[in-house]
Each structure stands twice: as structure tokens, then as C-alpha cells.
């Protein structure tokens, strides 16, 4: 594991790239009680065209698919990942930006179990027709919430006016 010391911050960061390409970073915080874990992937709202692994042809997916998948990843075969984190005494969340989707947890107990749960649920997707319909309603409510936020509207209005042809204009 590579050890990187940042003199100005007085912090040591550990980094390892696994055989499967996953990059792992650890930042020990002496004197802190809470553990924070985050899994991030380079797939965000602007990623609407790409060549799938093992294929040669470019495909186009629906706008909003990254945000939709962010929500659906929490659906596990035997329940909901957020509920499983809660059983371990952890809080969990996720977010999608224009270039990334991230899943995270924070906890003061069961750190190893939380890391295992995080790595497990982000690697399996369980979608049913029923869960898709349910998610449509949840995402519609989120959109309405953002539409009521003046700061959000100004920001995305500016982005849409600056980037007429780029997918960053679509949240």
C-alpha cells in the first residue's frame, strides 16, 4: 500500500489499486470516533452514451439513468441496503453529480461490516417492474423538491444556458 504524506495538512493517506482496478484510499484520523466510507464510480448524469464492456457499438441511454440507478442500487435481493446499514448503527446515503455516482455511510460501530455491505450492494442490481414504478414516484417528488429551490433553479438555469448541446445541462 502506497503511503502519501501531505505536509501542509499533516495527514497521511494510504492508496492501493486492486487487481480489478478498484482504487482504495484510507485516511486514518487519530482521535476521531466516526468512520466514513464512500464508494464512487465515474458514471454520472452526463454519461448517456458509451460503449459497454465487451461490446464495440456505442449505445445511448435515457437521460437521468445514473440518478435512477443510484436509487435502485439500494434495492437488495433480501431488503434495502439503507435498512441494513441502520441495523448496523450506520447512516447511509448516495448522490449523483454530472460525472460521478457515490454511495456512502458513516458509523461509530461495526465498521468492517459496513464496508462489506457497501462493497456488496454496489456490485449487484435487483430491479423489478414494481420497483421501477415505485421509483418513478420517488424521483418525481425529488424533482418537485428541487424545482421549489430557488438556488437550484438559478444554478441549473445558468448551466442550461451555458451548455446548450452538452448533457451537463440535464440533471
Regions of interest found by a model, annotated:
Residues 18:
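Acidic surface patches and DE-rich sequence motifs
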Residues 27-29, 95:
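Short beta-strand micro-motifs enriched in acidic
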Residues 11, 32-34, 98-100:
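Extracytoplasmic
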Residues 2-15, 159-171:
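Histidine-acidic residue clusters that define the catalytic metal-binding segment
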Residues 77-171:
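Acidic/histidine-enriched segments that form metal/cofactor-coordinating
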Residues 38-110:
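M16/MPP (pitrilysin/insulinase) zinc-metallopeptidase core fold and M16-derived inactive scaffolds
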Amino acid at each position: 500500500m502506497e503511503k502519501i504524506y501531505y505536509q501542509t495538512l499533516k495527514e497521511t493517506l494510504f492508496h492501493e489499486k486492486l487487481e480489478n482496478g478498484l482504487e482504495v484510499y484510507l485516511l486514518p484520523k487519530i482521535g476521531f470516533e466516526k468512520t466514513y466510507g464512500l464508494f464512487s464510480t465515474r458514471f454520472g448524469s452526463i454519461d448517456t452514451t458509451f460503449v459497454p464492456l465487451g461490446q464495440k457499438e456505442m449505445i445511448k441511454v435515457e437521460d437521468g439513468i445514473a440518478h435512477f440507478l443510484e436509487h435502485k442500487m439500494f434495492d437488495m435481493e433480501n431488503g434495502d441496503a439503507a435498512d441494513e446499514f441502520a441495523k448496523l448503527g450506520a447512516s447511509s446515503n448516495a448522490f449523483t453529480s454530472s460525472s460521478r455516482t457515490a454511495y456512502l455511510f458513516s458509523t461509530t460501530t461495526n465498521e468492517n461490516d459496513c464496508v462489506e455491505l457497501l462493497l456488496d450492494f454496489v456490485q449487484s442490481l435487483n430491479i423489478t417492474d414494481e420497483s421501477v414504478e415505485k421509483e418513478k414516484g420517488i424521483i418525481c417528488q425529488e424533482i418537485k423538491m428541487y424545482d421549489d429551490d430557488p438556488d437550484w433553479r438559478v444554478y441549473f438555469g445558468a448551466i442550461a444556458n451555458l451548455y446548450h448541446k452538452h448533457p451537463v445541462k440535464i440533471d
